[in-house]
Regions:
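Hydrophobic alpha-helical transmembrane segments
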Residues: 1-63, 100-201
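Basic, amphipathic juxtamembrane/active-site segments
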Residues: 74-114
Length: 201
């Protein structure tokens, strides 16, 4: 069970916004680049001003990013805007945005740099394994338990928590360790989905 499974409900809430954007000639690629720019700006701000209180921004930005990610996909599929450039921007944008938004955790007090870097590596690995499934079977794997939406929820809540209760940062490394384990589990599940689908065929 992952948050990805409630994506259809989220999309239905965003559909009026999608039609408004389409009517005003906003393309899927515009939305993708906006999400990337927002993530890079926020990440840079959190790195340059490494104050826990600023991590209040993280849940807000992550929610906006999730909405933008949903909108770019909807515009691409439902408004006939799918392009090869869009696919490249989407996949690379997701990985770069994840790094930009989660790298600032490295600069928080009590954070072990090696654990944060390991977590970021595992994040990239899960996305790679999802794409690997698409390359082999033609269907991208979104298997959990720690997909993009789940990460946004957990890390957004943690950003809120350390902003309000800075003393909670003593648990940073425990969270990075658990997150890395869940990410590796996710990567394994995505690879297994490739094997199962191949066996069924």
């Amino acid at each position: 069970m992952t948050l990805y499974q409630i994506k259809p409900l989220f999309q239905s809430l965003l559909r009026p916004t999608m039609f408004w954007l389409y009517k005003h000639h906003v393309t899927a690629n515009h939305i993708t680049l906006t999400a990337l720019a927002l993530s890079l700006f926020t990440g840079l701000l959190l790195v340059l001003v490494a104050q826990p209180i600023l991590f209040l921004l993280l849940p807000i930005v992550l929610f906006i990013r999730m909405a933008l990610n949903a909108l770019d996909g909807m515009l691409a599929r439902e408004c006939n805007q799918q392009t090869r450039l869009g696919a490249i921007l989407n996949e690379n944008g997701d990985v770069i945005s994840d790094i930009a938004l989660y790298l600032p955790f490295l600069f928080l007090p009590e954070s072990n740099a090696s654990l944060v870097i390991l977590m970021l590596f595992c994040t990239i690995l899960t996305e790679f394994c999802g794409l690997l499934a698409q390359t082999i079977n033609g269907i991208r794997s979104y298997a959990g338990p720690f997909g993009k939406s789940d990460r946004a929820l957990i890390f957004g809540l943690w950003g809120l928590a350390v902003a309000i209760y800075p003393q909670w940062m003593q648990w940073n490394n425990l969270l990075w360790s658990i997150a890395s384990i869940l990410l590796l589990w996710t990567a394994i599940n995505r690879c297994r989905s490739v094997l199962f689908m191949s066996a069924e065929r």
